[in-house]
Swiss-Prot record:
Chief localisation class: mitochondrion
Enzyme class: transferase
GO cellular component assignments: glycine cleavage complex; mitochondrial matrix
Binding site for substrate: 235, 266, 404
GO biological process entries: glycine decarboxylation via glycine cleavage system
Originating gene: GDCST
Record's function text: The glycine cleavage system catalyzes the degradation of glycine.
GO terms of molecular function: aminomethyltransferase activity; transaminase activity
UniProt entry keywords in alphabetical sequence: Aminotransferase, Mitochondrion, Transferase, Transit peptide
Superkingdom of origin: Eukaryota
Compartments where found: Mitochondrion
Organism expressing this protein natively: Pisum sativum (Garden pea)
FT transit peptide: 1-30
Name this protein carries in UniProt: Aminomethyltransferase, mitochondrial
Family per record: Belongs to the GcvT family.
Length: 408
């Protein structure tokens, strides 16, 4: 969402705190309450003080009783439980499923071991990003994906269009959209010890990016050790009829240390981790190379291509892109999406795509794009906010060190 969820959260919180009508706020934020979809945890959120706002066609909690800053810090120190059921999980199956998906994404899907996954990007014919997605190889003929809520319709239409053409040529592939499941994200240092209380599976042997189908709290779940915060954690796909029960069990086992957390803190956490938000930092005119996601292009894919827009992307890989995604630390007010970036001579060199105040660093941080050659850490820039220049410096990302659970 343009401008960042943290900023949206602050704006909506102020409106509600000042006596703003919830329906009026909903209308201003793109949809009426009656038009919004609700996850199975909607009543659970409301009962726990969730401030519900429109997001990607859903009514979602932007925050709870804690401030966005306090929620961010608690995730880093203890843990957070997020309802991310608005995102779309789907399974692709068939003996030709790997070759099919490799036409649409940049990952080396064939090289993935069973039960492992990776971040990838769906690209268009011009090499731009249709969406980013976490893809997991369950088996050679079963892939599991999660795509962004705001991109669901276009992603599914894109996949379906290419699937029809692929099947018309004799390819064996089918799909199932997991609308019968809910998705919870458990993040933070207490995520693993708390979840361990609810499963017999030894989670110490499940590493970052790995996937299992297992029993959690009496329900068959899809468990991926991943997340969107930079912390260790899990995404749990649970049958929707057991979603509330699982959320309650996780909170109970944490003895109050893991807290329900909304989209506002989730955005500040991902910003501190230097991760892209589709619609801000990644869009249809931005390539994976420009976005700093070169690492996501498998070695074999760099040699063979074969995905949409490969000619553009591989040329950028060889020659270098004209713009690059970078991080910034700045003075003055927090940078906003679309804030102009200038060099020290006052020349336009780029634009901020995400920005805000870092609760952990107690500094303003931002992500944006600048001209190649001006992307190196330590480069001094000016960020224009409300017509005034503010000092900034290009900074390596992540801003806050990540704590992914990997083999030692």
């Amino acid at each position: 969402m343009r401008g960042g969820l943290w900023q949206l959260g602050q704006s909506i919180t102020r409106r509600l705190a000042n006596g703003g009508d919830k329906k009026a706020v909903a209308r201003r934020c793109f949809a009426t309450e009656s038009e919004l979809k609700k996850t199975v945890l909607y009543d659970f959120h409301v009962a726990h003080g969730g401030k519900m706002v429109p997001f990607a066609g859903w009514s979602m909690p932007i925050q709870y009783k804690d401030s966005i800053m306090d929620s961010t810090l608690n995730c880093r120190q203890n843990g957070s439980l997020f309802d991310v059921s608005h995102m779309c999980g789907l399974s692709l199956k068939g003996k030709d499923v790997v070759s099919f998906l490799e036409k649409l994404v940049i990952a080396d899907v064939a090289a993935l071991a069973h039960g492992t996954g990776t971040l990838t990007v769906f690209t268009n014919e011009k090499g731009g990003a249709i969406d980013d997605s976490v893809i997991t190889k369950v088996t050679d003929d079963h892939l599991y994906l999660v795509v962004n809520a705001g991109c669901r319709d276009k992603d599914l239409a894109h996949i379906e269009e290419h699937m029809k053409a692929f099947k018309a040529k004799g390819g064996d592939v089918s799909w199932h959209i997991h609308d019968e499941r809910s998705l919870l994200a458990l993040q933070g240092p207490l995520a693993a010890p708390v979840l361990q209380h609810l499963t017999k599976e030894d989670l110490s042997k499940l590493y970052f990016g790995e996937f299992r189908v297992l029993d959690i709290n009496g329900s068959q779940c899809f468990l991926t050790r991943t997340g969107y915060t930079g912390e260790d954690g899990f995404e749990i796909s649970v049958p929707s009829e057991h979603g509330v029960e699982l959320a309650k069990a996780l909170l109970e086992k944490s003895e109050g240390k893991i807290r329900l957390t909304g989209l506002g803190a989730r955005d500040s956490l991902r910003l501190e981790a230097g991760l892209c938000l589709y619609g801000n930092d990644l869009e249809q005119h931005i390539t994976p190379i420009e976005a700093g996601l070169t690492w996501a292009i498998g070695k074999r894919r760099r040699a063979e291509g074969g995905f949409l827009g490969a000619d553009v992307i591989l040329k950028q890989l060889a020659d270098g892109p004209s713009i690059r995604r970078v991080g910034f630390i700045s003075s003055g007010p927090p940078p906003r999406s679309h804030s102009e970036i200038q060099d020290e001579g006052g020349n336009n060199i780029g634009e901020v795509t995400s920005g805000g105040f870092s609760p952990c660093l107690k500094k303003n941080i931002a992500i944006g794009y600048v001209k190649s050659g001006l992307h190196k850490a330590g480069t001094k820039v000016k960020i224009i906010i409300r017509g005034k220049q503010n000092e900034g410096v290009v900074t390596k990302m992540p801003f806050v060190p990540t704590k992914y659970y990997k083999p030692s």
